[in-house]
């Protein structure tokens, strides 16, 4: 069923939520990348573009079904409801792990440079890397607020003791070997970019420039960013727990002293 490291089966895993405007455009780019890599002899023709419909309310799933009928390289799965970006990525990875040699997860909006996949595959084939992180070399397309909050977020995570790759989101290559180890994680609050380094296999990074969104609007508002940040901090670091525990001990100690003081005052007053 599987190919070899020299001719691996690649599954490109793409989470989709209400992407009817951008999907008809980027789907062609993903297919072209697959066919180009096959033509160059870098991957097997059994490679696929795997779309994960995350409970979309628009025509996203209908478009995915039409794509699957149009070309064998397109396949899709659909979640029964919207479970969030991280869960959608994980669902795609788990769907692919027994069918491929490597996966590359990437968003549907076209902001991540698809051409970086060539270097990712090369790092797997030639250098034996099991994980390859896509790292943004520039964030010129982001607003000042987003750049500032992103930088602060990474600094906070590192200060909390979490191991994360700076300027890396969810654009990465993972081998099937890594995916099978990753399947053993039972984390409820998913923060994939922090969980992947914990697996511990040989890794490297590939730099790329981030583009403007090709079409449609972002489905990742500030509220979701804050929620992801909270999940990252609470799931990867014990420092918040230690802080809360220490604070609780101090409060309990002060309360105990207060009670003793009140008893003494009452006895002296009597």
What name fits each language-model region?
Residues 1-142:
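Structured catalytic core of nucleotide-sugar glycosyltransferases
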Residues 1-9, 193-270:
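Hydrophobic helical membrane-anchoring modules
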